[in-house]
């Protein structure tokens, strides 16, 4: 790779991600095209594919960032020495809160759980967190056990996120 190419790619990636976030929030993930993202970033549509293989690859990058921030925010809110059960309760609550803020954010969460690469990342990362939080308490559990618990939990969260709670009228 020629000298100076790395910063150029990083700048393009950053511009594409910023444009994508703006468009995803305005139009939703499904309705936003790669052409629209490239245009909003002030680049050609071919420039998009020089940075990301497809729109799902961009979603994966964004999903990784979102979940890293979400975990960091949860830990910061709880402070030092938090109980693992508290983290396990608060983190999905933050997800639900974010998803309830707007239809576009909710759709972005649902999309993240709907595509193979992003869903796999979420499940693997959440499994790692479960092992970190509860592995010492449950030494008899394997990573596979924690993975299956993650699948069950994320299924419930995704089901709740699929429909805006305001549509449930009592």
Question: Residue ranges of each PLM-predicted region?
Answer:
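Catalytic or ion-translocation cores adjacent to nucleophile or general acid/base/metal-coordination motifs
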Residues: 12
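Helix-turn-helix
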Residues: 15, 23-57, 61
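Amphipathic alpha-helical packing segments from all-alpha helical-bundle domains
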Residues: 113-162
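N-terminal intrinsically disordered/low-complexity leader segments
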Residues: 1-8
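Hydrophobic alpha-helical connector segments
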Residues: 61, 72-105, 115, 125
